[in-house]
Amino acid sequence: MYLLFSKLNTVLHDPNIISIIIKTRNKQAIKQYISIKKSRDLMITVSNEIDFLLSKNKTIGEIVEYVSKKFDFIKYPIIWYSLIRKYHLKIIVETGVSMGWSSFMILTALQRENSGKLFSIDIDSSETVKREGGIGYLVPNHLKKYWNLVIGDTNKLLKPTLDELKQLDMFIHDSDHSYQTMSYEYNLAWKFLNSNGFLCSDDINHSNAFDEFISQHKHEIINIYIIEEIQRSSDDVNKRPMIGFLQKIIS
């Protein structure tokens, strides 16, 4: 109990937490709010650091390694944010949202660009995510004007989404990491990707779909990047996740 209320000392100025205390007196709701606020504050700090490093003309690789170590922060949201800010990407499609770490960072980048839209597709969330607030619960209301979230299977929803958009600047795969789904999403999104745009994927070492895609489209790719993720508690120590992103040739 002491730990909970010592944490409250840092947020009692926040009208939202005061409202929760008055209305519910629910310790779990208070702890959840504090946890979400802490995560959001960290992501804003990370975003600010990335912007500073971009202003110093640091490369994406330098930014990712420095920021992930400094803040003990997962790399893939750093990459997505950095690409959007560096290349001023506008139309983004992602498959897989979960809590919303990537979505928060992407939407913050679009807000700072003062334009653009994120189209996210995710199937029904896990029980843990549901308990915390549902798919994308880390995304605050003020960022949602840049966001179109659809709940469902990417195998059914990705094609109509892309057909409606007609083109995009960035595609991010982080849904089902089976060979079939990864290969399907990569090949479909590539058809709609603008020249100089990016095809990105988390967990590329779950199958050979990413390597196969590169082999099939190497004449259309200008840059290939592979980055090893930081070690996370849920990871197999012998199979650390790998992140990949490709830049399409400028036509």
Regions found by a protein language model. Name each.
Residues 66-71, 77-251:
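S-adenosylmethionine/decaboxylated-SAM
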Residues 37-74, 85-86:
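Class I SAM-dependent transferase core
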Residues 1-52, 249-251:
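Membrane-proximal basic amphipathic "stem/tether" segments
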Residues 22-35, 49-61, 133-140, 159-166:
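Short charge-dense sequence patches
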